[in-house]
Amino acid sequence: MIFNGKETECVSVLGARVHNLKNIDVDIPHYKLTVITGLSGSGKSSLAFDTIFAEGQRRYLETFSAYARNMLGVLERPDVDKITGLSPVISIGQKTTNKNPRSTVGTSTEVYDYLRLLFARASDAVSHISGKPMVKYSVEKILSLILEKYEGKKIYILAPIVKNRKGHYKDLFEQYRKKGYLHVRVDGELKEITFGMKLDRYKNHTVELVVDRLKVSSKDEKRLKDTVELAFRQGKDQLLILDVDTNAISYYSKALMDPDTGLSYLDPAPHNFSFNSPQGACPKCKGLGYVNLIDREKIMPDMSLSIKDGGVLPLGKYKNSLVFWQIAAICEKYGCDLTTPLAELPEEALYDILNGTDEKLNIKNETLSTNNYFLTFDGLVKYIELQQDEESGSKAQKWAGQFFSRCVCPECGGARLNKEARHFFINGKNIAQLASMDISELRDWLADLHHHMEPKKWKIADEIVKEILGRLDFMLDVGLDYVSLNRASASLSGGESQRIRLATQIGSQLVNVLYILDEPSIGLHQRDSHRLIDSLKKLRDEGNTVIVVEHDKDMMLNADYIVDIGPKAGRRGGYVVFAGTPHQMLAQHTLTADYLSGVKRIPIPEHRREGNGHFIRLRGCKGHNLKNVDVDFPLGTFICVTGVSGSGKSSLVNATLQPIISRRLYRSLTEPLPYGEVEGLEHIDKVVTVDQSPLGRTPRSNPATYTGVFTDIRNLFVNLPESKIRGYKPGRFSFNAKGGRCEVCSGNGYKSVEMNFLPDVLVPCEACGGKRYNRETLEVKFKGKSIADVLDMTINQAVEFFDAIPAILNKIKVLQEVGLGYIKLGQPSSTLSGGECQRVKLAAELAKRDTGKTLYLLDEPTTGLHFEDIKILLSVLEKLVQKGNTVITTDHNMDVIKCADYIIDLGPEGGRNGGNIVAFGTPEQVANQKNSITGRFLKKELSEK
């Protein structure tokens, strides 16, 4: 391959036919930054991930033993003739976010591991009882201290053997009696060890063994030394000195110790600062930082209801059952009944209903025909906790789980670590405090640390700090200055988690690796895009090949090489329409090239809607980093919430507004972030969240089933004369139910053939030929087409086929209008891209009848979308707003922002420096706000009108 006039090695893909790829050949240069672009569904991911990465992964797994391959499961060979020049491949995608609650930004980047090492080697311990520095002495130092303090005095030397624990300790006393020890000190009182001696087993006891009683003299130092060493052996490196005259106690230890209280710590090791280790984790929350507690508000969400009307959610409405008879008895005890609204019940009655009572209740019920049936009541809380028990089934646990709320651990305050770990400090900060800092703040703190450390300790810390600073710099380079090390990995967006993995890879300093990234610019404000591009170039310059699936204009123009897949999507895509440098591409006339060169652009609306005069007003929002903000959302408009990454957009919309509305409209149990008050919810009757998650959890889900049109199609086939003659019901035409489906493949259309030590092979079902249905079902036809033929049609074909059946046509036509005419009606959702899934969901909403009072929430809807796809998306959103609905989207894409009616811009920065409303109003108004970073970029965009 010739690149910039020089011959270079490349990854050569020959005859790729994965998904919709049309037997394409393409060369991708080594040691360059290559962008693969094209419409959503054109075949970009099919080439990058399902062909190049899949083959690289398969080759890697083939180096394993046959046994290991069988255990791991082997990737199927992609449908490609040949791939040459393939170096080891690492994929950094969006869908691999770690959902483990123990995974944090710090653990996944290994920065926290280095911090643990730093604290194990260079921290200072402080007593969590007295707050004084812990000390550590050698045996020689302890001897000199004893001689200095007790010269000429009579003392007992004691070895601690039991510390504040329950038990009778009969065997322990007998063991020491046989060894020749005569006395012990039990709970501060000296006692002789007698035969059969034991303590109250149900009380906590502290026991010290009397090792020796002597008068301290420097002339008899050998006896003192022997006694001290013996006491250390018996007391596990700890001893006490009891002054015979004053009864004063002094503590000594070879480990870290508080001389005032006797508290001792083990010598710090890295695992002592790990919340994933028993030695470091908080005993209350087991290192999670939170505990799940039963929430009374979730059990009784609507206090205006009575118990009989379903006010107690776990019970539902009144049934003639024992639990209601028991609660009726409690109500009678407090002078009320089951029809009394919960808000009017005495607090004592509510307490007994929730927590139970030991008092025997007089059960009165006509069904029992008795008034003399007495029972105690354990309470709803205990019942729910029993359902949550590990021995309960998953269904019961899921049911019980809805009544729990996650609360910050009361013992560690969310730090995840035990008391000891939290009382080791470096320059006044413990490891949990450092982990809670923003990356930028932590970097500054560490960079200044050498000014605050003793030279001896800095010599130990220097290399560790350098390693941490290097990794933090990589995170700053990819725009993650606002996250903290203790941020849970599960809470990261796809783009954030991908950039964290990118920073980790840069830090690993691998060479000769092929990296494949899926839209790393997701969730990144335009201000930070150049930092990301510089990071990718740094990865390239270290001697790696970087392939990026991307639509970002800046990324494309800064690439070394561009591969444009198209010309359209689905069946009309899958071709390489251009491959070359950005400069060469600007001279072309592909769809992508036209948008890059400015020949095509998304138009700016002529007018901005002012809305219907109603507002949703949120007051006092202060969750996460929101700074007690007040915000108004004008209804009947297209609103865009903007701001740099980490400024609080998702906290405001997804974690505050959406749960508030869902609670009000649907009695949802999801807890919103803290806020003051909300007004205007009476002006909406429905909230719809449209994201890019898959349509369903299995490949059986498809556009026809999701939009509901498949039900209409099945009903059409059921009402055909042939079906009526045969007595077929709608279930006959479902591939999910027995009867009409092919039972050989269970309606899948294919069979998985196990090859033992080779990859499993998916082959079309020999019984149905991949059609999913049995022969009898396929004999029923409409206009010459069976149900399987209909599912195999593209949306465009189906629109023509069902042109005379409005019930079906209207739903399918909406799919066509949102730009999905190329996908099949029965296409498995697992093969749809994120952008395609989102548009299927939007189409399903457009097809529904609405009252014009629906609120649509979209989180970064442009993810995975080409310029042309964004144009189609905006036209769909326009239709929703024209019907009187409200659309709120959070996005960084300037094409979306410039088309909004109203903008709410958060900032000014991310993390702790964000969370304020810096600008609001029309795009033109925000563009003129000098303190708005978004406004600066918007001004440039609007000037190109």
What are the language-model segments listed below?
Residues 1-945:
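Conserved phosphate-binding elements of NTP-dependent enzyme cores
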